[in-house]
C-alpha cells in the first residue's frame, strides 16, 4: 500500500534543480537525499504488519489470560486513516487555473495581434524626420491639440502635461 501511494507522488528532480536558485542548491541536494532515504525506508516496509505468534507468547508469559487480553485488544484496535479532504479542493483549483490560463492565453494572443497591427502601422508610416505636424496628428490622433475645448496654450488639460 505504501509503495502504491508513493508511486503517485514522485518528484521530477531534473526540472526541480533547473528552477532552483544557485544559492539554494545545497538545500535542494539535502532534500533530495532525505527524500531518497525516506523512499527506500518506506519501500522496505510491507503493506501489512508482520503476524504475531500468539502461541509463543502464551507459552512464555506466566500470567494466564494476559496474552488473550492483549490479542483481543490488538484485534480490536483500528487505526483510522484520515480522510482526504484536500485532493478535491486542489483538483478544483487546478481546473480553475487551467481555465484562467486558457483565458490569459486567449487574451495574450489578442494583444499580440493588436500589437502586430500597431507595429505594421509604425513600419508603414512616414519617417519622423519627414513628417509634418498634420501627418503626426493623422498617424497619432492623441497628439492633436484641442484648441476649441482648451483655447489657451498648451491646449490640453494640465493633468496630461
From Swiss-Prot:
The keyword Ion transport applies. The modification N6-succinyllysine is found at residues 78, 85, 95, 144, 149. The modification N6-acetyllysine is found at residues 32, 48, 63, 78, 85, 95, 117, 144, 149. One of its GO terms (molecular function) is protein-containing complex binding. The modification N-acetylalanine is found at residue 2. SUPFAM superfamilies: ATP synthase D chain-like. GO terms for biological process: cellular response to peptide; proton motive force-driven ATP synthesis; proton motive force-driven mitochondrial ATP synthesis. Keywords: Acetylation, CF(0), Hydrogen ion transport, Ion transport, Membrane, Mitochondrion, Mitochondrion inner membrane, Transport. One of its GO terms (cellular component) is mitochondrial inner membrane. It is found in: Mitochondrion; Mitochondrion inner membrane. The keyword Endoplasmic reticulum does not apply. InterPro entries: ATP_synth_F0_dsu_mt, ATP_synth_F0_dsu_sf_mt. Pfam families: Mt_ATP-synt_D. It comes from the Eukaryota. Belongs to the ATPase d subunit family. Subunit d, of the mitochondrial membrane ATP synthase complex (F(1)F(0) ATP synthase or Complex V) that produces ATP from ADP in the presence of a proton gradient across the membrane which is generated by electron transport complexes of the respiratory chain. ATP synthase complex consist of a soluble F(1) head domain - the catalytic core - and a membrane F(1) domain - the membrane proton channel. These two domains are linked by a central stalk rotating inside the F(1) region and a stationary peripheral stalk. Component of the ATP synthase complex composed at least of ATP5F1A/subunit alpha, ATP5F1B/subunit beta, ATP5MC1/subunit c (homooctomer), MT-ATP6/subunit a, MT-ATP8/subunit 8, ATP5ME/subunit e, ATP5MF/subunit f, ATP5MG/subunit g, ATP5MK/subunit k, ATP5MJ/subunit j, ATP5F1C/subunit gamma, ATP5F1D/subunit delta, ATP5F1E/subunit epsilon, ATP5PF/subunit F6, ATP5PB/subunit b, ATP5PD/subunit d, ATP5PO/subunit OSCP. This is ATP synthase peripheral stalk subunit d, mitochondrial.
